[in-house]
Structures are given as C-alpha cells and as structure tokens.
Amino acid sequence: MISWISGELVELWQTNQKFFLLINCQGLGYEIQVLESLFLKLKTNQITNKNITLWIKHIKKEDSDLLFGFSSKDQKNFFIEILNIRGVGSQIGMGILSKFSISEVINAINTQNKKLICSVPGIGQKMSERLILELKSKFRNELKIQEEKSKDEFHIKDNKINKIVSDIELTLKSLNYTKNEIKSILPIISKEIDSLTKKEKDTSFENLLMLAMNYLDNDSSNIVR
C-alpha cells in the first residue's frame, strides 16, 4: 500500500483532460495523475528538478496500476469517499476536486446545489442526486460545522468587495429568493469577484447580480420560491 510519494519532479504533461507528473523516487519513475490546480501551479512556476510530496491513492485494475496524487491528505480522503459511491469512477472524482475545493463541495451538498455538481463533466442529474445524498451522510459533522460558519463565511476584509456581496444578497432577498438559494450562489459570486480587476470591482454590481439571477433562474432543481 502506497500512502505517499516524495521525490524529484522530472516532467509534467497533459493528455486530454488528464494531468500527469513523473516523479523520480529513489531511482524509480512514478507516473501520477494529479488535479488540474496542482498541475497548473507547477507548470506556471516552471518547477522541475525539485522535490515534492504527494498523498497517493493506488487503484489496481486488471490491465494497469493507476496512481492518483494529492497535495493534502484531506483531498486524498475526500477522493476515496467519492470513489465509494456506486457508479462514480476515478475521473469523476478528479473532476470534482479539480473544479471545486472540498469546502465548496460540502457547501453544495449542504444547500443541495445539484446544478453546481452537474457542472462537472460526466455528472448528470441522477448522479448529482446520488452524490449529494451519499456524501451528506458521510460528511454529517463537516456539514454541521459548515452551517454554523455560514453566517460569517463571506465577511471579506476588503470593504468594497464585502459591500458588493452584501448588496447582492440583500437584492436577491428583496426579489424573494430563498435563503438556501442565496447561500448556494455566494461562493460563485465571491470567486467571480476575486478574478476582477480593481476598476471592474467598482462597476461590477449589476453584472454580478445578473449572473446570480441567471444562475438561480436557470436552475430547475432549486426549491420553488
């Protein structure tokens, strides 16, 4: 059983939507599939000939041995929990963790945001329902903590950004969107704001509000208002 691998990064490459590293560990070359976020970080920083450590999930098949590497033990454990769900394969698991952080997935489970889960390639309506149902039982404690922190989750230090988020939240409330609907859209709005320039942040309220409304109105799985 391989728990982790620590060695020299030799090469990194992409095959379709899969991202790989080659690591030299004591003279052996390990080909490891990693999350897109880690791959891009290493590629952007042009890091080679440097030691890195990855938490490993080893999947043995009839015709191959597959290694999946993660930068944290939490990511690895979350990946394993996803694989334990019937009908969910390794590429679905990698797709979920490549697109969202663990806290974002837990928030989507807590708010039953099926559309967010369905945005991962390969996940349809039925699979999203199964993922939410089964992960909700597996991460009951984490969901309770998430719910307790939800009120403070989006208190941002930048006053201008915090005001934009608060204004959007108040506007959505005035338009009769439910608390759960608003809670489900705030991580997306916050992520969108993070990508804006300083000039864009001064003029982005209307665009972000429209983004939120379009997202919620097009989500047929949301609770009826």
From Swiss-Prot:
SUPFAM superfamilies: Nucleic acid-binding proteins, RuvA domain 2-like. Residues 161-225 are annotated as: Domain III. Keywords: Cytoplasm, DNA damage, DNA recombination, DNA repair, DNA-binding. GO terms for biological process: DNA recombination; DNA repair. It is found in: Cytoplasm. Residues 72-150 are annotated as: Domain II. GO terms for cellular component: cytoplasm; Holliday junction resolvase complex. Gene3D superfamilies: 5' to 3' exonuclease, C-terminal subdomain (1.10.150.20), Nucleic acid-binding proteins (2.40.50.140). It holds the Pfam family RuvA_N. Its main location: cytoplasm. Has three domains with a flexible linker between the domains II and III and assumes an 'L' shape. Domain III is highly mobile and contacts RuvB. The RuvA-RuvB-RuvC complex processes Holliday junction (HJ) DNA during genetic recombination and DNA repair, while the RuvA-RuvB complex plays an important role in the rescue of blocked DNA replication forks via replication fork reversal (RFR). RuvA specifically binds to HJ cruciform DNA, conferring on it an open structure. The RuvB hexamer acts as an ATP-dependent pump, pulling dsDNA into and through the RuvAB complex. HJ branch migration allows RuvC to scan DNA until it finds its consensus sequence, where it cleaves and resolves the cruciform DNA. Belongs to the RuvA family. This is Holliday junction branch migration complex subunit RuvA. It comes from Prochlorococcus marinus (strain MIT 9312).
